[in-house]
From Swiss-Prot:
Localization: Secreted
SMART domains documented for this protein: RNAse_Pc
Secreted as UniProt keyword: yes
Gene behind this protein: RNASE1B
Top-tier EC class: lyase
Protein name: Ribonuclease 1B pancreatic
A GO term, aspect molecular function: nucleic acid binding
Domain of life: Eukaryota
A Pfam family matched in the record: RnaseA
Amino acid sequence: MALDKSVIPLPLLVVVLLVLGWAQPSLGGESQAEKFQRQHMDSGSSPSSSSTYCNQMMKLRNMTQGWCKSVNTFVHEPLVDVQNVCFQEKVTCKNGQTNCFKSNSKMHITECRLTNGSKYPNCAYQTSPKERHIIVACEGSPYVPVHFDDSVEDST
């Protein structure tokens, strides 16, 4: 009789674990492509020289929760133009991987750098609007940007 009591919860446990496994991605898990867009895309605006742009955007895009991200770049171009970089000039990533691509043309970006002495929870950023070639790492099917690797002044 004790055996019967232990057998009933096991299938229930299996069902619960399966449901949690299927539901997990929809419970806030974000793909690398979605994370790239959240952290780097700001298509609806122009590069800003406003000293508050980076402070506001870094907080709004959840990059100051628990710590201050030291550097981040926002791209002010249509998403499709940034996605098309994945089919442009292939370059080696800073970490040595070979899935990086450099934009053929310069793009409008804003670079955010943590100011000296700034510490969590009071993250303060210097805002620098620029026009540069961007380098992104691409993966997946469809092939899309998943990591902002760098920006460079010229195309060489």
